[in-house]
Design a protein with these regions (language model features):
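Short, well-ordered beta-strand elements
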Residues: 35-46, 65-70, 97-98, 146
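Extracytoplasmic "Venus flytrap"/periplasmic binding protein-like
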Residues: 57, 64-133, 137, 165-174, ...
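A structural signal for short loop-to-beta-strand junctions that line the ligand-binding cleft
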Residues: 86-91, 95-97, 123-164, 197, ...
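Hinge/lid segment of periplasmic solute-binding proteins
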Residues: 101-154, 180, 195-196, 211-214, ...
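Short, solvent-exposed loop/beta-turn-alpha elements that line the ligand-binding surface or hinge
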Residues: 117-130, 198-209, 222-243, 290-292, ...
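Extracytoplasmic/periplasmic solute-binding protein
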Residues: 142-150, 155, 180-233, 275
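Glycine-centered hinge/linker elements that transmit conformational signals in sensory
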Residues: 182-187, 229-260, 291, 302
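C-terminal capping/gating helix-and-loop segments adjacent to ligand/active sites or protein-protein/ligand interfaces
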Residues: 230, 354-360, 374-426, 430
Length: 435
């Protein structure tokens, strides 16, 4: 081989070697540089100062990840979130990477959500860490999990301690018959026969804050199977469902009612000291504390039918990830991080700096800590037995049920025909939204 060819081969070898070394060096440098991920997180009640310290901690532990927390109005949140997720599928309209969803929404929202990867949390771990209602509520028809709860909440009895003491009760009775007897004893009427002190706020919809939640609880108590397995049909006119509905409206229709349509909103009347017992969640307790410090009140488990298995009604929120997120895996890692005991405690502590208590812990392992707080004690007792209904179209279904309650309780309509009419409307909607 002549010298010229040797020189060319030598140069080629040097060039090839340089390219190989450069490629290796670039690969090493790129692998050592953290990936840049920007995520948007939609919340609606926890203020920036409550959530931001946890976001800062996650960002410090995961260089390159930037999370923006955006507070949304709770009013119309369901339709706002759904519209954004829907538009993000077909356009460049931005949707949140991470968002809060109600425990009843999964059938409607599932098509726009990213399932929880087993690499982040397995189904087995999930079922051990969270209450049975969370497993049922956040699992889609495809068997995949679509949200992690950062809280647990549900209906409780909020009671005026002074009014109960005056009538000889320390706490509301836990069996249904004794509870109703107490409600009757605690109801007072004026000379014209009208209620001036309600023993129990129940039976209407326009002036009862949680009317549909109470009705759903009655369905559970009466073992009414109101929702089909695929979540596309509601059965509101079965004998058990009708009996539960009629029981609810009977509280304002019977001879000696404990409540009436002419009374103010139950929360307002309770704050005025004129309601002995009402149904509400932990967030209603916070509202009462904000409105007044003059009412000494307690929170008790729901009364139940003693011959049935224990069951209580859950209404709470989970945290999910959008299918169109820029990085679904990183988003889910952050959600799991928020759900860890250390972070839940810190969230609670941050919130408790500005209000009486933080979000009730969602993890089964933290139940004893819930039981230590007088405002969450009842939740700690009921949480293992809570259930709900995955209706999907929560706002629509609840509005139709409120209309039915008003039609029957206040306008004297037939419950059967009224419920048949709204059932047809609801099922037409669910057949599209929950498919």
């Amino acid at each position: 081989m002549d010298e010229k060819k040797k020189k060319i081969l030598k140069i080629l070898a040097i060039v090839v070697g340089f390219v190989i070394v450069l490629s290796i060096l670039m690969a090493v440098l790129s692998s050592s540089k953290p990936k840049q991920v920007e995520l948007t997180f939609w919340g609606f009640w926890e203020e920036e100062e409550v959530m931001h310290p946890l976001i800062e901690k996650y960002e410090a532990e995961n260089p390159g990840v930037k999370i923006t927390y955006a507070i949304q109005p709770l009013k119309n949140y369901e339709s706002l979130l759904y519209t954004r997720l829907e538009q993000a599928e077909i356009s460049n309209e931005p949707a949140p990477d991470i968002a809060m969803i109600h425990n009843s929404w999964v059938p409607k929202f599932r098509k726009y959500l990213s399932p929880l990867p087993s690499s982040v949390m397995s189904a087995d771990e999930y079922s051990k860490e969270f209450y049975p209602t969370a497993i049922e509520d956040f699992t889609g028809n495809d068997g995949k999990i679509y949200a992690i709860p950062l809280q647990i909440d549900g209906l409780m009895i909020i009671y005026n301690k002074e009014l109960l003491r005056e009538a000889g009760y320390n706490v509301p009775p836990t069996d249904w018959d004794s509870f109703m007897e107490a409600a009757d004893n605690l109801t007072k009427r004026g000379s014209n026969g009208k209620i001036i002190q309600s023993g129990l706020a129940i039976g209407t919809s326009r002036n009862i804050t949680h009317s549909t939640d109470i009705l759903f609880y009655f369905y559970l108590q009466n073992l009414a199977q109101i929702l089909s397995e695929d979540k596309t049909m509601m059965e509101l006119t079965s004998p058990r469902a009708l009996a539960a509905f009629d029981k609810y409206t009977s509280f304002v229709k019977e001879k000696n009612p404990t409540w009436a349509s002419y009374l103010p909103n139950d929360l307002t009347y309770f704050v005025d000291g004129k309601v002995a017992m009402m149904f509400g969640t932990s967030w209603r307790a916070l509202e009462i504390l904000e409105y007044t410090e003059n009412i000494e009140f307690g929170l008790a488990p729901l009364p139940r039918l003693t011959n049935n298995d224990e069951v209580y009604y859950a209404t709470y929120w989970g945290t999910t990830v959008s299918k169109t997120s820029k990085d679904t895996l990183e988003a889910w890692k952050f959600v799991k991080f928020l759900s860890e005991p250390e972070q839940l405690r810190r969230l609670y502590q941050n919130a408790a700096k500005t209000r009486a208590f933080g979000e009730p812990y969602s993890r089964v392992s933290m139940n004893a800590e819930l039981a230590e707080n007088k405002y969450t004690q009842a939740l700690a007792y009921m949480a293992p037995y809570m259930k709900s209904f995955q209706v999907g179209e929560q706002a629509f279904v609840e509005e139709k049920l409120r209309q039915a309650i008003t039609a029957v309780a206040e306008n004297g309509r037939s419950s059967n025909s009224t419920l048949q009419a709204i059932q047809n409307e609801i099922n037409a909607r669910l057949a599209v939204s929950n498919k």
